[in-house]
A protein has these predicted regions:
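Short, well-ordered beta-strand segments in beta-rich or mixed alpha/beta enzyme
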Residues: 2-9, 39-67
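An amphipathic, aromatic/His-enriched active-site/gating alpha helix that lines ligand/cofactor pockets
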Residues: 26-36, 54-90
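Glycine-rich beta-strand-turn "strand-cap" elements at beta-sheet edges
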Residues: 2, 39-49, 75-106
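Non-catalytic surface loops within mature trypsin-like serine protease
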Residues: 10-12, 57, 93-96
Length: 106
């Protein structure tokens, strides 16, 4: 499992605009090989968000970043004036995974 995260700092008062942009955009992720899940997380501190995507593997994620699906998803609307600066990307390989489904199967 591979996780890609982007942290965002949203300009004060523009949180609704930021969330609406994410809710209304076409992600093109559902049919991408290796894609498993996407979450947009709102932090406790005002204006702090994280987008988190979960992939079968690093290779699946990297293939997506070179795909037309990636380009199409990132061509939609600008967040200029909504963000305080560019997002900060972090990439992680899963070391341990525990979830309710795995526990239920045990």
């Amino acid at each position: 499992m591979f996780v890609a995260m982007n942290s965002f700092k949203v300009v004060h008062g523009r949180q609704d605009d930021f969330e609406t942009a994410w809710r209304t955009r076409q992600t093109y992720l559902q049919d991408v090989p290796g894609f498993q899940r996407f979450l947009l997380l709102r932090g406790d501190a005002a204006g702090e968000y994280i987008s988190l995507s979960i992939w079968e593997s690093r290779d699946a994620f990297l293939a997506w970043t070179q795909s037309e699906s990636f380009a199409a998803g990132h061509r939609q609307g600008s967040l200029a004036g909504v963000l305080e600066g560019p997002p900060n990307a972090k990439l992680y390989e899963a070391v341990l995974v525990e979830d309710a489904e795995a526990t239920a199967r045990a």
